[in-house]
Amino acid sequence: MNRSSLATTSLLACLLAVAGEAHAAGPVAAGATCPDASQAARIASAYAGATAPMPFMAAAKLGLPEVVVAGGLPAALGHGVDGKAFQAVWQSLGAWPDAVVMIRKGANIFEIRTRVPTGKPSTRSKLFNLDHDAALSGHLRPDLFTAIHAIQAPGAEGFMRGVFFYDDSGESVLGVFVPPAEAPPAAQVAAFDKTLALLKTLPPRCPRPAG
């Protein structure tokens, strides 16, 4: 990497670190990230059909924070853990042969077909620096992640298998999915299954809904 690229990368990292420290807009109250009994019943109803919506789509329809919807998914459709599990989960995603990374910003959605880059914590800040050997790179703030949820369910456009990362806004920061296909390669499904199995070795973030 040349000197100009290094300077640009360093500047970007500094800006991201400052932005991360200022992150406090509209957090969801710590005790309100799991559904109560009434909310759980509404979420179960939203996921009772033949196809399941993405959590952010169900959240908009139900008028609930997305992280609450994710926390209320029936056990057969997913598993959620505390955000402190980031490094173990991200390392597992790095073993996937291929992925689609979904990033939402307001009403906009970016989808990047890429191998999930590995990375390591910065020695100078709270950033987790992604490697530069994939189509996607960047700098994450895993200390701000409050929840990680895997979902596996039949969707309107095919079976979805993915992992969402949430912060205290109650919205997903990003999602990592098995690329959509009528019959995805067995290696991709197996890689997702390993990540899901890892998540299931950890305590669930919310009480397990039935189903």
Q: Each PLM stretch: what is its role?
A:
Residues 1-10:
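Bacterial N-terminal signal peptides that target proteins for export
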Residues 9-18:
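Bacterial N-terminal signal peptides
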Residues 23-211:
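Eukaryotic intrinsically disordered, low-complexity regulatory linkers and tails enriched in Ser/Thr/Pro
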